[in-house]
């Protein structure tokens, strides 16, 4: 996964082509979340103008499709497929969800996976968020609870980072259609 920042916004195509030639799966993301130690992610993030220029290409590389979403839309596939384990054994629902719910040094990984908290998070829908199910940007947005938590300490709030990506997608989508 390549995070796209102000510094490297012109070289992700080279990395993508290298991965394609070498049959390596590749993902690219311009949603830069605040650092786990200090809230400085916005210093590296692309402006809306910069993001609009490349968002369609990022979406094509990642296979993103614009779809209508009901209030029961499950917002995050990774929460149903994987866990993130920190260097000290902390288990987090994903790499963006900066909150440990267990520790592999003390708990069995299968028990952690089957835990109610993980299941609840993996079934997070638009209606579980504060405003996502009624937002006009909903079909363009990732609605990432991990980014919302990193940005504002509330996984159900509207993430400004996700909102900026959604605006860039909408501007590109409306320009084409």
Predicted features, each with a name:
Residues 96-177:
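Flexible mid-to-C-terminal extensions adjoining Fe-S/redox cofactors in radical SAM and related proteins
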């Amino acid at each position: 996964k390549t995070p796209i920042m102000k510094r490297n916004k012109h070289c992700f195509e080279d990395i993508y082509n290298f991965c394609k030639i070498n049959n390596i799966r590749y993902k690219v993301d311009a949603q830069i979340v605040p650092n786990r130690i200090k809230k400085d992610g916005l210093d590296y993030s692309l402006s809306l103008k910069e993001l609009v220029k490349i968002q369609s290409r990022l979406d094509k590389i990642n296979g993103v499709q614009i779809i209508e979403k009901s209030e029961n839309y499950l917002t995050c596939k990774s929460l149903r497929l994987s866990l993130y384990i920190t260097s000290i054994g902390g288990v987090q629902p994903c790499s963006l969800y900066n909150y440990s719910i267990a520790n592999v040094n003390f708990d069995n990984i299968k028990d952690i996976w089957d835990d109610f908290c993980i299941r609840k998070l993996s079934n997070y829908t638009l209606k579980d968020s504060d405003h996502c199910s009624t937002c006009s940007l909903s079909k363009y947005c990732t609605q990432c609870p991990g980014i919302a938590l990193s940005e504002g300490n509330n996984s159900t709030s509207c993430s400004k980072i996700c909102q900026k990506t959604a605006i860039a997608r909408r501007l590109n989508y409306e320009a084409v259609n």
